[in-house]
């Protein structure tokens, strides 16, 4: 390993040697824009089946509608910004890489850490929900517990270890099955819609309360977290950049197509589920779509049973896909030296084996020991919201700092678009404290420990060869030539 070190922006870089990057190669060309769109939908689709409805208890239907509309605007604006950033900087680091270019090593690591918290914790929460779902369906008498959690982690981490192309294609099929379930639900609920069902939660004496927003203005803010569920994790699509055939063209098309589909699903589910079954009836449901069908058509109706079983595919799709996401973010942070370098070594099949297994083991232990899916998903939401603030800020900073940077896709509206997302992301961070102070506190604690690790250790050991860091070297060389 080369001994030469160079200090840039308060961090120390070294050349890791010729063989370093050869041991850290992903399989290029595994995905086109259609698979990327499917990946984006897969990340999110479990949120259409469950979770969003708890916002009915926090803000009523009107409060959740307002929150969802605002979050839809935030995600849409952010996705347009990410489409530009991912075509401009098409590397596996994604959000970390964007912030690294705009905000320096500390900003890059902070963003990557927030994303990693989101993606490492979310599968642990989802596997708990899968366990509850399997038990409620009485599939072969299987009960929720550590054995089931271990089996799901082992199977789906194993598929990712086998190969990214195979994993993405299987993920696409599972996601397609889950989408069919949503479409069947929509067709079955359209004839049952009654607008009076949307506002059947009684108004309270909270400030600003009415029949439309029965829990007042505070209820709207509390519902933000649940409006996020319709879109949470779509921002992970750029993590596939190094495994995409033509990232400069495919990445914008894939992430935007995925977002458009999610907007349609959110509008249909939020309107038809409570509109057919009643907002109050679904406000505490663990399985809102089957419960809505049960109220409208009967618990023993074929359509109710069908969507109930298909709902498991939605949970599995998100679990499967987010494992992919955490491995790529961890891989990129490790490859660049922000986290231990051994975590980024790839296998002979060009999959980041260690980055798949280590967070999987941690997630399994969290699920088995705590069995507290609600707290963990709120931790994931808090991490996500922090990353949104930093990623949208990165887009704004890069537009002003590097206006001549080659941008194969340009965000419509420019910084005005991502500026809207930035403001709403700050509001989303604040909203997490209204819903779960414990989860927000845990996330902040983990974040602080990670930043301390960076400040006192890893910033002195960064790798100049990593693609996300080479942009810095190129920029510095150009500046020296110009000078």
Positions of the model-derived regions?
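Helix-loop-helix junctions that connect adjacent transmembrane segments
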Residues: 22-26, 64-65, 141-147, 173-308
């Amino acid at each position: 390993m080369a001994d030469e070190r160079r200090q840039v922006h308060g961090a120390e870089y070294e050349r890791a040697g010729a063989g370093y990057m050869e041991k850290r190669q992903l399989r290029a060309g595994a995905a086109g824009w259609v698979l990327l769109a499917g990946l984006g939908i897969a990340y999110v689709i479990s949120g259409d089946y469950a979770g969003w409805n708890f916002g009915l208890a926090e803000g009523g239907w009107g409060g959740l509608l307002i929150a969802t509309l605002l979050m839809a605007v935030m995600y849409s604006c952010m996705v347009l910004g990410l489409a530009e950033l991912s075509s401009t900087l098409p590397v596996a680091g994604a959000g970390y890489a964007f912030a690294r270019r705009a905000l320096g090593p500390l900003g890059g690591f902070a963003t990557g850490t927030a994303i990693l918290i989101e993606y490492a914790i979310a599968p642990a929460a989802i596997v708990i929900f899968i366990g509850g779902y399997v038990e409620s369906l009485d599939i072969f008498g299987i009960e929720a517990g550590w054995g089931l959690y271990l089996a799901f982690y082992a199977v789906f981490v194993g598929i990712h270890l086998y190969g990214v192309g195979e994993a993405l294609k299987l993920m696409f099929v599972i996601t397609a099955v889950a989408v069919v379930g949503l479409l069947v639900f929509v067709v079955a609920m359209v004839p049952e819609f009654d607008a009076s069902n949307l506002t059947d939660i009684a108004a309270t004496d909270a400030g600003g309360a009415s029949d439309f927003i029965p829990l007042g203005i505070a209820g709207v803010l509390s519902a933000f977290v649940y409006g996020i569920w319709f879109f949470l994790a779509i921002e992970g699509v750029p993590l596939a950049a190094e495994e995409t055939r033509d990232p400069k063209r495919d990445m914008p098309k894939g992430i935007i197509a995925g977002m458009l589909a999610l907007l349609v699903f959110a509008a249909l589910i939020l309107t038809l589920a409570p509109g057919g079954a009643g907002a109050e009836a679904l406000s505490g449901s663990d399985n809102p779509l089957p419960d809505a069908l049960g109220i409208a058509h009967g618990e023993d109706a074929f359509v109710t049973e069908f969507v109930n079983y298909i709902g498991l595919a939605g949970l599995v799709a998100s679990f499967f896909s987010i494992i992919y996401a955490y491995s790529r973010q961890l891989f990129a942070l490790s490859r660049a030296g922000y986290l231990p370098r051994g975590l980024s070594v790839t296998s002979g099949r060009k999959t980041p084996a260690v980055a798949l297994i280590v967070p999987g083991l941690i997630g399994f232990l969290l699920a088995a020991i705590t069995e507290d899916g609600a707290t963990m998903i709120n931790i994931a939401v808090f991490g996500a919201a922090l990353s949104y603030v930093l990623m949208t800020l990165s887009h704004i900073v890069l537009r002003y700092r590097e206006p001549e940077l080659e941008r194969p896709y340009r965000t419509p509206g420019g910084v005005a678009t991502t500026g809207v997302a930035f403001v709403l992301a700050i509001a989303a961070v604040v909203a997490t404290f209204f819903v779960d102070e414990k989860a927000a506190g845990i996330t902040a604690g983990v974040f602080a420990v990670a930043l301390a690790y960076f400040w006192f250790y890893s910033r002195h050991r960064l790798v100049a060869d990593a693609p996300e860091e080479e942009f810095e070297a190129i920029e510095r060389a150009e500046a020296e030539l110009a000078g």
